Amino acid sequence: MSSPRNGYRDRLILAVDVGSSVLRCHLYNQSGEICGSAEDKLKVLYPQAGYVEIDPESLWEQFVRVVKEAVADAGIQMSQVAGLGISTQRGTFITWNKKTGETFHNFISWQDLRAADLVSSWNRSLLLKAVHGVCTALHFFTRRKRFLAASLINFTTQHVSLRLVWVLQNIPQVRQAAEKGNCCFGTIDTWLLHKLTKGTVFATDYSNASGTAVFDPYLMCWSSFLCSLLSIPLSIFPPVEDTSHSFGLADPTIFGAPVPILALVADQQAAMFGQCCFDVGSVKLTMGTGSFISINTGETLHTSIAGLYPLIGWKVGDEVVCLAEGNASDTGTAIKWAEELNLFTSVADTEAMARSVPDCGGIYLVPSFSGLQAPINDPYACASFMGLKPSTSKSHLVRAILESVAYRNKQLYDTVLRETTIPITLIRADGGVSNNNFIMQMTADLLGQTIDKPKHTDMSSLGAAFLAGMAVYGPLKTS
């Protein structure tokens, strides 16, 4: 059936992006145009200080609902959907019983800080120092980059590794099930695939796997060394497939038709693909809940000293594209916090408020509700305003918050320049916060660069659609 609104008769690509704040679904035609959309605010739980969780059943209900609403918005039947691509926040994970499918706990978010003490303890440990020493020697004799990377390894709370160790140590059912080979680990993409296929498919892709810090991107497999070091059973991890891949069919009882699942991709890598940052030296700056700066390093994995992370951008057939990435966790978080304090009534007002004063009045915000990431790398850093005076107004505070985003963007950009020594060919921005022209202009001024921003900023969804569409329409045409 064609849509009475857009007359669309061909088959569409569904793309769902499970972000840290919002769950979005768009339907795209072959030209990459949006034909239908739906979204829902993600329900995030904060059960105690430092804990950030997502109820899996609530997420599943939201996922199914936005897909159905987007299809209805496009005015088509589910049978007209050619395929589904799923983009998800990275590093948020869950474990479940392999036999029953019952989850052992809520999703533990990438923003969760419950493992902060474990992170600090491991980073100070003699064992990790010994690992650094041995790997430094191995790198000296072999010149292999994976040994250099291991010699520099330090854990962070954003990595799955020590949050998973926390789960194994503190939730007895998980450890017991793992010991019996009856435990499955999954990031959001893996769990959604499991649910969509009624438990028949257990898999992830290279982009999501590489974002866990339990995957060895140099060997392209789960790290047996790290799992041995941390006493994590390798048996719990899913097989890793290409990013654009036929993962199976969504059970027809869910949507009313057997929708092919054709792409799983991590959100930042999806945004990189959606922005068509295919050339070495192209940079993508995403500003959403957090800020993420990624540079395409081609076939070469970057080994970082300051906290940039080597990632698999995507794998399609024989092509593997690598990225180096740095992030700041609390971009949108800081703006949302200010809104909840009634510093402004609408996010749309912040730009005008910032411009209503000539400067920040000596007020500065350290935007570290979840610690400070690269290049500072301090999980215990606390958010704080500095320079408060009796004359400080709401506009000064709002301007300081927006400026803090630009300053962190500058820090991350300088880290990329200093560490990779790759000539930057272009910079493209996306994410909800990139709609703020004050932040964008200040960032461009600080970087001394022109920053391209598309009209449509949901690049993670578009990237997932492109990757799924490749399985339907063939290779992407970039000319």
Curated annotation (Swiss-Prot):
Gene name, Swiss-Prot/TrEMBL: gk5
Q: Write the Enzyme Commission number(s) for this entry.
A: 2.7.1.30
What residues does glycerol bind to? 90, 267-268
Entry keyword Manganese = no
Picking any one GO molecular function of the record gives: glycerol kinase activity
Please name the Gene3D superfamilies in this protein's record: 3.30.420.40
Protein name as it appears in the record: Glycerol kinase 5
Q: In which pathway does it act?
A: Polyol metabolism; glycerol degradation via glycerol kinase pathway; sn-glycerol 3-phosphate from glycerol: step 1/1
- Tell me which UniProt keywords the record has, alphabetically: ATP-binding, Cytoplasm, Glycerol metabolism, Kinase, Nucleotide-binding, Transferase
Query: Which EC main class describes this enzyme?
Result: transferase
Which reaction is the catalytic activity of this chain? Answer: glycerol + ATP = sn-glycerol 3-phosphate + ADP + H(+)
Tell me the residue numbers annotated for binding ATP.
20-21, 289, 332, 432
Where is it localised?
Answer: Cytoplasm
Q: Name one GO cellular component term.
A: mitochondrion
GO aspect biological process, one term: glycerol metabolic process
User: One Pfam annotation, family name?
Assistant: FGGY_N
Q: From what organism does this protein derive?
A: Xenopus laevis
The record's similarity note reads:
Belongs to the FGGY kinase family.
Function description = Skin-specific kinase that plays a key role in glycerol metabolism, catalyzing its phosphorylation to produce sn-glycerol 3-phosphate. Involved in skin-specific regulation of sterol regulatory element-binding protein (SREBP) processing and lipid biosynthesis.
